[in-house]
């Protein structure tokens, strides 16, 4: 083996300039050269591809790229040398004119420097002045990086510039070159300037012949394609079907108008004769709210994306102003009335300006900013590639934003947030009524109430409120109150068409979103409503409100909360902040085994736990704990489905949707039990009450047993008297705790 077969640093004892090899090799050869200059590492055959190079460059992208650029600017030099030992087969050093002076002597794995050497062989290397380079010999200031690839392949400046542009932009490259050149002596500064001109030489003479020349035929086809593609992405709606057909007809019959509108800048207004275009404005405003035009009766201050509608009968004008992002919608709307467009001939340019070199370069650099930089380039068979790690990014689609059940976990504390109901506002259009006042709700126009009709549907459970409108044939505003996910809402909208003559349903907007969640495993549940500075009591509602970032979380007894107005990621963030403050409280005592048990049960049944199930499982858990049994067995039974339930078995709320399914009488009949010869509702302490919360309510003749249970729970949960501070029955709890400690075990 020889040192000539490895990548190494060598001292520059005497620098000479010789012609480089004529062959630039392939892309992988240039990637290998760049990898050595940037990473100080010889790339393997599998790593000589862009995707693998991206992975290697990722830790210090800018530093590695600038290091390679600095070494390229210093250029390639040849050092006189002679090999007296083993010479690898097929390796041939560069030949030049005879030289006498200082040089290198290679002998196997070693090399020596000498001041008296006569040779005609030279070893190539790229000069390096990095602070990270090793110190070879104090007698020689300069050093080169040698690798065998330089013996057969020359550096391709064009490819090197393309690789550098993959990781840094032109401004960063210029800044790197400028700072580096300012630190060099005049000779090396001149060398860097010359090599930088080689690196950017192809920018001075770009290949203009590769750019397609514009023609009228190509421009016409492109404009038609863009407009038709825009129309095909419109939603399926009967009110848009007629407009789409008219636009397509206008594109076919008036291609000149389309070219005129495409060439017209957004700062120029389009003039339309007649009021026919106005009948599509309301439909477009409902279906495309982000591009909805504004109807102006006065001249707009800023003529951007404006349509001037001229009334031929009154000689008056109306202006439609679109957002700048709605320029394509303006073109489509004008093509629907293409025969009424007033075309201004002076706006058509007589000739096209010649493309300048500077504008072509600017366009190229702008395209580089948006070009994909992670496309795979397969240079070798796929079996030699190592699998690339892929980051799992959460999907941000509309379905995940409107989940009926959201799972949240903070430090292994799990919470399930349920959607109780959502209020959605939208608009509908209906069939034409044959009579003058017989409309979809069968009421005369003299009735001008806020809500004139309300429908309740059992399956899927939802209610629809219809607001008063002057003409229901054009548009009617409705309010939908429904629970569930977005699929349930789509089913409800299709069910609405079964009993109302609905022809179109316009895009909906979320008016309100109500959610609720329970904290399971918190032993001192009173902590959520007392002992906190960030809550306040409401005067007309038995709850404590925690207000943060403009949103309120209402806490009821037994650690149950409701959240309104927000959904999706905002809801998750709000609940996380609320829970983090509670479980991080210094007096909070949490049973993670209980938390896992009840959270798993909620996830399996997709419903909050009812009062009867909660009490049964709380008692069963405390019995297992009292008799030193394995409480994890309950969690395993829950996971097997032994305690599954249906939310419709026992009513636990007065939700209007449950009432629509079961009836009001059933929903109002909360189960009652006889305690102390008195009927008591199961949820008198709260639907989510734990064992400590209702221990004092039952069995008054079993005082000693309850005291022992209370002492056992306090010992297991490390509860002290100050943990009950702020509770409504704090004195009773403290007294019971003292008595329990005085009792023998």
UniProtKB/Swiss-Prot annotation:
InterPro entries: Herpes_UL87_C
UniProt xrefs under Pfam families: Herpes_UL87
Annotated family: Belongs to the herpesviridae UL87 family.
The name this protein goes by in its record: Uncharacterized gene 24 protein
Source organism (scientific name): Alcelaphine herpesvirus 1 (strain C500) (AlHV-1)
């Amino acid at each position: 083996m020889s040192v000539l077969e490895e990548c190494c640093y060598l001292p520059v004892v005497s620098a000479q300039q010789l012609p480089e090899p004529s062959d630039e090799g392939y892309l992988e050869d240039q990637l290998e050269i760049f990898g050595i200059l940037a990473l100080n590492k010889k790339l393997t055959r599998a790593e000589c591809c862009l995707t693998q190079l991206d992975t290697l460059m990722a830790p210090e992208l800018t530093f590695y790229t600038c290091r390679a650029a600095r070494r390229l600017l210093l250029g390639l030099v040849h050092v006189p040398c002679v090999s007296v030992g083993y010479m690898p087969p097929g390796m041939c050093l560069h030949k030049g004119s005879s030289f006498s002076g200082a040089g290198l002597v290679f002998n196997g794995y070693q090399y020596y420097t000498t001041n008296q050497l006569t040779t005609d062989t030279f070893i190539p290397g790229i000069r390096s002045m990095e602070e990270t380079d090793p110190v070879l010999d104090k007698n020689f200031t300069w050093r080169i990086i040698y690798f065998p690839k330089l013996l057969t392949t020359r550096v391709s400046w064009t490819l090197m510039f393309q690789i550098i542009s993959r990781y840094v932009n032109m401004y960063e490259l210029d800044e790197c070159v400028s700072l580096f050149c300012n630190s060099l002596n005049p000779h090396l500064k001149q060398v860097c300037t010359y090599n930088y001109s080689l690196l950017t030489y192809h920018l001075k003479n770009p290949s203009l012949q590769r750019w397609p020349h514009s023609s009228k035929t190509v421009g016409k086809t492109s404009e038609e394609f863009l407009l038709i593609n825009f129309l095909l992405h419109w939603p399926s709606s009967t009110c848009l079907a007629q407009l789409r057909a008219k636009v397509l007809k206008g594109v076919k019959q008036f291609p000149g108008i389309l070219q005129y509108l495409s060439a017209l800048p957004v700062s120029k207004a389009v003039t339309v004769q007649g009021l026919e275009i106005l009948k599509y404005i309301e439909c477009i405003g409902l279906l495309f709210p982000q591009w909805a035009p504004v109807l102006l009766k006065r001249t707009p201050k800023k003529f951007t994306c404006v349509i001037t509608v001229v009334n031929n009968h009154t000689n008056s004008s109306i202006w439609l102003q679109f957002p700048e992002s709605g320029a394509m919608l303006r073109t489509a709307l004008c093509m629907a009335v293409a025969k009424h467009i007033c075309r201004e001939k002076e706006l058509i340019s007589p000739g096209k300006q010649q493309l300048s070199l500077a504008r072509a370069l600017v366009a190229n650099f702008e395209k580089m900013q948006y070009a994909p930089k992670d496309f795979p380039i397969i240079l070798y068979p796929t079996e030699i590639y190592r699998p690339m790690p892929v980051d799992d990014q959460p999907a941000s689609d509309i379905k995940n934003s409107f989940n009926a059940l959201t799972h949240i976990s903070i430090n292994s504390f799990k919470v399930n947030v349920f959607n109780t109901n959502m209020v959605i506002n939208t608009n509908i259009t209906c069939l034409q009524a044959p009579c003058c006042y017989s409309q979809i709700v069968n009421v005369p126009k003299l009735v001008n109430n806020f809500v004139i009709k309300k429908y309740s549907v059992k399956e899927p459970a939802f209610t629809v409120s219809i607001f008063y409108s002057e003409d229901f044939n054009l548009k009617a505003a409705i309010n939908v109150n429904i629970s569930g996910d977005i699929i349930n809402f789509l089913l409800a909208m299709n069910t609405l068409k079964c009993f109302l003559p609905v022809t179109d349903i316009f895009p909906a907007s979320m008016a309100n979103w109500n959610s609720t969640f329970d904290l399971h495993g918190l032993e001192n549940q009173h902590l959520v409503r007392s002992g906190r500075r960030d809550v306040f009591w409401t005067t007309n509602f038995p709850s404590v409100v925690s207000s943060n970032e403009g949103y309120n979380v209402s806490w009821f007894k037994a650690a149950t909360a409701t959240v309104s107005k927000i959904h999706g990621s905002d809801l998750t963030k709000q609940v996380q902040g609320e829970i983090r403050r509670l479980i991080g409280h210094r007096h909070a005592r949490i049973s993670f085994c209980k938390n896992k048990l009840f959270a798993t049960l909620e996830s399996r049944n997709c419903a909050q736990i009812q009062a009867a199930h909660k009490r049964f499982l709380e008692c069963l858990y405390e019995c297992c704990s009292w008799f030193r049994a394995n409480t994890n067995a309950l969690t395993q039974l829950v996971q097997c489905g032994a305690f599954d339930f249906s939310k419709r078995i026992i009513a636990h709320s007065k939700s209007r949707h449950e009432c629509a399914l079961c009836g009001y009488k059933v929903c109002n009949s909360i189960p009652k039990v006889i305690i102390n010869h008195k009927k008591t509702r199961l949820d008198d302490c709260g639907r989510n009450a734990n064992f400590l919360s209702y221990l004092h309510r039952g069995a008054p003749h079993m005082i000693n047993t309850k005291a022992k249970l209370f002492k056992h729970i306090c010992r297991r949960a490390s509860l002290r008297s100050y943990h009950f501070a702020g509770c409504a029955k704090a004195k009773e709890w403290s007294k019971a705790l003292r008595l329990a400690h005085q009792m023998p075990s």
